[in-house]
Amino acid sequence: MSHSISMHDDDLEKLGESLNEIIMSSKAESVLQAARKKKQEFFDHYIKTKKTLTELLNDLVHTEEVVGQKLLDLDQQKSQMMQEIMKMEQEVQRSQSKSQNLDSELEFLQKELERLRDAEQEIQTLQQEVDEDTTEVIPSAIYVAQLYSKVTKIKLEFDTEPHILKGVHYGADVVTPINIDTSTRTPCEVSDELWSLVKTEW
């Protein structure tokens, strides 16, 4: 019995040695080192990937901020452009209104110019008629007045008020002043008073 146990212990020892030899001969250590290396490479790759992802996320956040700011700037520019467009439309409306007012004023001035031209033509026509009358009538009136003055011996003043008739009658013996308010008398009464100064004796 003891001999069997001793043999069993020897077998176990031999088996352990054999296993150690197998482990050493099967390059388990190199496999373990390779596994550790693989693990380290995987860890390094994980760290690198995580860093890359972090950078990508940071870039994405930065890009979103830049794009968001650009959108805000574009909205602000759009708002400013809309305000400018509204101002330009208002200016166009004011210009159109001014243009319409100017057109109305121009039309009014053209009508006034035509009216003034017509009035000028009428004045020229009247002036021509007056010139003709002056040429023909005034000398005749002067002649009649001179003849009247010689016959009646009455010399009238012409720088008096319109309703006052002033002058002098030169009689043979006496000079009689004349001062008649024609607004209080009829033309016949004035004529009779003047002729009363004239002697009918020849």
Curated annotation (Swiss-Prot):
This is Kinetochore protein Spc24. Gene3D superfamilies: Ncd80 complex, Spc24 subunit. Residues 69-138 form a coiled coil. GO terms for cellular component: Ndc80 complex; nucleus. It is found in: Nucleus; Chromosome, Centromere, Kinetochore. The keyword Nucleus applies. Component of the NDC80 complex, which is composed of ndc80, cdca1, spbc24 and spbc25. It comes from the Eukaryota. Pfam families: Spc24. It comes from Danio rerio (Zebrafish). The lineage of its organism: Eukaryota, Metazoa, Chordata, Craniata, Vertebrata. Acts as a component of the essential kinetochore-associated NDC80 complex, which is required for chromosome segregation and spindle checkpoint activity. Required for kinetochore integrity and the organization of stable microtubule binding sites in the outer plate of the kinetochore. The NDC80 complex synergistically enhances the affinity of the SKA1 complex for microtubules and may allow the NDC80 complex to track depolymerizing microtubules. One of its GO terms (biological process) is chromosome segregation. InterPro entries: Ndc80_Spc24 (IPR013252). Belongs to the SPC24 family. Keywords: Cell cycle, Cell division, Centromere, Chromosome, Coiled coil, Kinetochore, Mitosis, Nucleus. The keyword Cell division applies.
